[in-house]
């Protein structure tokens, strides 16, 4: 690769393209002489829409095809929603950059007949659409009277299903709705005492081939230090729990002065068990904070909960 060319691998979904176009534009602004092209493609997760994500298996469900392009020398970088990027990357690839995080909250989206309701006032039997086991487990814990139904497809397809009456409400990532221009559909941001967000939610992760210093230098434009530290703690927490993108593990992080605060959660799929705690430490110890919190939750039964989930997924 020469310094005058950069090829970006991306999923071709509408949200992925919005995110990748933003990355391209920011890099182009910082490096006006760089010729940047986008190679868009469908991933396994984009193609299989009639099966719940958790039943497909989650190792690189939305990333493998993009990674193959880089390993074959057809692209220099790949843009991911960081929450979709596994914590263990293929040999030869690294996480080169994490962008500034947008709101990582989960959001409640309702149809016309439920405009009068908040999540806590939805009537018994209301149908809640979500494809996330993390959201499912936490909401079952707090609202066992609601009915949860899997929902797949892109954001527009999901909104159409909601508005047609197939669901009473949806739980979606606030950042995705905002990036797609649907901020007006956010009816309620779900408080973190109800739903901790996914690891990396709201941030973009840019993956690249290891050893490519010229590429890393180009990506420095987009690196956001505090987001990176927060996500480092979150990803080490997830890695230590041996969890993936489709497990009921949630987090919340913040940085106050030089102190990093990580809150983590593991829940059973039936919503009957939920283990949650907080760990604090120096920002420079972000990775260790994640590991320590994971081990604390394991000591309180999180490992057994996850093993039950992994067993049921393999069955």
Swiss-Prot record:
**Which cofactors does this gene product need?**
dipyrromethane
Give the record's cofactor note, including how many are bound.
Answer: Binds 1 dipyrromethane group covalently.
Query: What domain of life does the native source organism fall in?
Result: Bacteria
Q: Which UniProt keywords apply?
A: Chlorophyll biosynthesis, Porphyrin biosynthesis, Transferase
Q: Which gene encodes it?
A: hemC
Tell me what this protein is called: Porphobilinogen deaminase
InterPro entries, alphabetized: HemC (IPR000860), Porphobilin_deaminase_cofac_BS (IPR022419), Porphobilin_deaminase_N (IPR022417), Porphobilinogen_deaminase_C (IPR022418), Porphobilinogen_deaminase_C_sf (IPR036803)
NCBIfam families noted in UniProt: hemC
How does this chain assemble? Monomer.
What HAMAP family is this protein classified in? Porphobil_deam
Question: Listed GO molecular functions?
Answer: hydroxymethylbilane synthase activity
The EC code for this enzyme is 2.5.1.61
Q: Which residues carry this modification: S-(dipyrrolylmethanemethyl)cysteine?
A: 245
What reaction is this protein's catalytic activity?
4 porphobilinogen + H2O = hydroxymethylbilane + 4 NH4(+)
Which species expresses this protein natively? Prochlorococcus marinus (strain NATL1A)
Q: What does this protein do?
A: Tetrapolymerization of the monopyrrole PBG into the hydroxymethylbilane pre-uroporphyrinogen in several discrete steps.
- Cite a single GO BP annotation: chlorophyll biosynthetic process
Please provide, in alphabetical order, the Gene Ontology terms of the cellular component aspect for this entry: cytoplasm
Tell me more from the record. Answer: The porphobilinogen subunits are added to the dipyrromethane group.
Pfam families attached to this UniProt entry: Porphobil_deam (PF01379), Porphobil_deamC (PF03900)
Pathway it works in: Porphyrin-containing compound metabolism; protoporphyrin-IX biosynthesis; coproporphyrinogen-III from 5-aminolevulinate: step 2/4; Porphyrin-containing compound metabolism; chlorophyll biosynthesis
